[in-house]
Design a protein with these regions (language model features):
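Cross-kingdom TIR/SEFIR domain
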Residues: 3-5, 15-97
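Donor nucleotide-sugar binding loop of glycosyltransferases
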Residues: 12
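Acidic, metal-ion-coordinating active-site neighborhood of RNase H-like domains
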Residues: 7-9
Length: 97
């Protein structure tokens, strides 16, 4: 089972990567979209890992607040009581979903 599911905008990948690396170095199994096998249905694969994860970290930026995928993944994680929101930059309340 995945410990932590990462939800973020692909535009933020390089800002999220060091966090992923640090958590992995501490022994956490981190799932992020770079692990989706070629030919696999992306939506199904992502949803399965999100639901099975112990927690989900949504990384918020000016880009990710506009991403339907990030917003949906955060909503699902919140409904399951396992959402951890991380601000990558200052945002206003009005920018959040």
């Amino acid at each position: 089972m995945t410990d932590i599911f990462f939800s973020y905008s692909s535009a933020d990948r390089e800002r999220v990567r060091p966090i992923r690396d640090a958590l992995a170095a501490q022994g956490f199994e981190v799932f992020w979209d770079q692990q989706v096998p070629a030919g696999m249905d992306w939506d199904t694969w992502i949803r399965q890992h999100l639901i099975k994860s112990k927690c989900a970290m949504a990384f918020w930026s000016a880009t990710s607040v506009s991403s339907d995928n990030v917003r949906h993944e955060a909503m699902v994680a919140k409904q399951q009581g396992k959402l951890i929101s991380v601000l990558l930059e200052p945002l206003t309340v009005e920018q959040f979903p």
